[in-house]
């Protein structure tokens, strides 16, 4: 750059700093690029698929899927992990359907959980914004976007047609929220539902669409599609769901990774089941017929017995998890991801 341009740039930068404050514009090389802070999801498989070890703080995350697919379970497990690490969590229950007994079973400290059950969508998003701006909450979950009913709709008649009202509400709220989320380093998770598009579809195009317009798709740094793909049985009794989670969008690591995990009724995501499946894949756990072995020790005949063994011997499970993290999770992934994101 020639001297005249340098002087002009220097004058412009000093004018900007004078008008808008120090640090309002800076060279990327002047600050240290730090690793992205994350909150673990409670699923080792998903943490690894996300490429950064969990859900990123200071970002918007969307989790969507059909009914009873495990959306709320996944967010409650993330809340439990956040609380275990000393963080503060808030749950904005627009659906008015949170079960505190189930949340406690998943490891959530219900006494410390901040809960709001707002009357309108505007109230829900205003509460979320105030919690984010406080800078003292680590994770805010909004359950769900579909239940964020605009005030005009609540005050109107049952059959009133108010097209695009919810989409406008979400678009306005996200414009306001994103800057505050980044500044306070809060993770905001929106749970969303699926609807079917009515009308003629193009071949190969999905008829499914998420509620609340397109704004959330753009503002979200991570989007997760979660679906039930089968049942887990113990004899004739169904004890849980086999669940597929796909990383549909990821601004911090390569997207489109997918994992198949198990959600057990009353327990949530089966940590021990994941350790066994990943251990077999990584050849750390040996599977001979129905028997599973880890090291020199047989840990059970059949997956259910192996799962019980790991639950009863937490030191073995912890050792296996440490080996799997070392094998699957590159140590420098978060730093590179943060670096790439900031260069965009």
Swiss-Prot record:
It comes from the Bacteria. GO terms for cellular component: cytosol. Residues 323-344 are annotated as: Disordered. Can catalyze the hydrolysis of ATP in the presence of single-stranded DNA, the ATP-dependent uptake of single-stranded DNA by duplex DNA, and the ATP-dependent hybridization of homologous single-stranded DNAs. It interacts with LexA causing its activation and leading to its autocatalytic cleavage. Keywords: ATP-binding, Cytoplasm, DNA damage, DNA recombination, DNA repair, DNA-binding, Nucleotide-binding, SOS response. It is found in: Cytoplasm. GO terms for biological process: DNA recombination; DNA repair; SOS response. SUPFAM superfamilies: P-loop containing nucleoside triphosphate hydrolases (SSF52540), RecA protein, C-terminal domain (SSF54752). Its main location: cytoplasm. CDD domains: RecA (cd00983). ATP binds at residues 65-72. Residues 323-337 have a biased composition (Basic and acidic residues). The keyword DNA-binding applies. This is Protein RecA. The keyword Transmembrane does not apply. GO terms for molecular function: ATP binding; ATP hydrolysis activity; ATP-dependent DNA damage sensor activity; damaged DNA binding; single-stranded DNA binding. Belongs to the RecA family. InterPro entries: AAA+_ATPase, DNA_recomb/repair_RecA, DNA_recomb/repair_RecA_CS, P-loop_NTPase, RecA-like_C, RecA-like_N, RecA_ATP-bd, RecA_C_sf.
């Amino acid at each position: 750059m020639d001297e005249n341009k340098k002087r002009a740039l220097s004058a412009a930068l000093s004018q900007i700093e004078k008008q808008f404050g120090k640090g309002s514009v800076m060279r990327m090389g002047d600050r240290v690029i730090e690793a992205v802070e994350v909150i673990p999801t409670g699923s080792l498989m998903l943490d690894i698929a996300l490429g950064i070890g969990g859900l990123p703080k200071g970002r918007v995350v969307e989790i969507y899927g059909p009914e009873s697919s495990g959306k709320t379970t996944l967010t409650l497990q993330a809340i439990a992990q956040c609380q275990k690490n000393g963080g503060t969590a808030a749950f904005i229950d627009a659906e008015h359907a949170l079960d505190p007994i189930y949340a406690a079973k998943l490891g959530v400290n219900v006494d410390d959980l901040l809960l709001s059950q707002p009357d309108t969508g505007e109230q829900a998003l205003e509460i979320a914004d105030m919690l984010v701006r406080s800078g003292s909450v680590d994770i805010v979950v909004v359950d769900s976007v579909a239940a964020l009913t605009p005030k005009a709709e609540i005050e109107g008649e049952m059959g009133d047609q108010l097209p695009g009202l919810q989409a406008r509400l979400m678009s306005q709220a996200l414009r306001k929220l994103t800057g505050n989320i980044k500044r306070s380093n809060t993770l905001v998770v929106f749970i969303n539902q699926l609807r079917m598009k009515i009308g003629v579809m193009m071949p190969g195009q999905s008829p499914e669409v998420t509620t609340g317009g397109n704004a959330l798709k753009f503002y979200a740094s991570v989007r997760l599609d979660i679906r039930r793909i089968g049942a887990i049985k113990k004899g004739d009794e169904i004890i849980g769901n086999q669940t597929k989670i796909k990383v549909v969008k990821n601004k911090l690591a390569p997207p489109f990774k997918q994992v198949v995990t198990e959600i057990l009724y009353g327990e949530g995501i089966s940590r021990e089941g994941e350790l066994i499946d990943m251990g077999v894949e990584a050849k750390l756990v040996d599977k001979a017929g129905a028997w599973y072995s880890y090291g020199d020790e047989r840990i059970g005949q059949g997956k259910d017995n192996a799962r019980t063994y790991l639950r009863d011997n937490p030191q073995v499970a912890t050792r296996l998890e440490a080996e799997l993290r070392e094998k699957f999770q590159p140590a420098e992934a978060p730093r590179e991801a943060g670096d790439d994101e900031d260069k965009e």
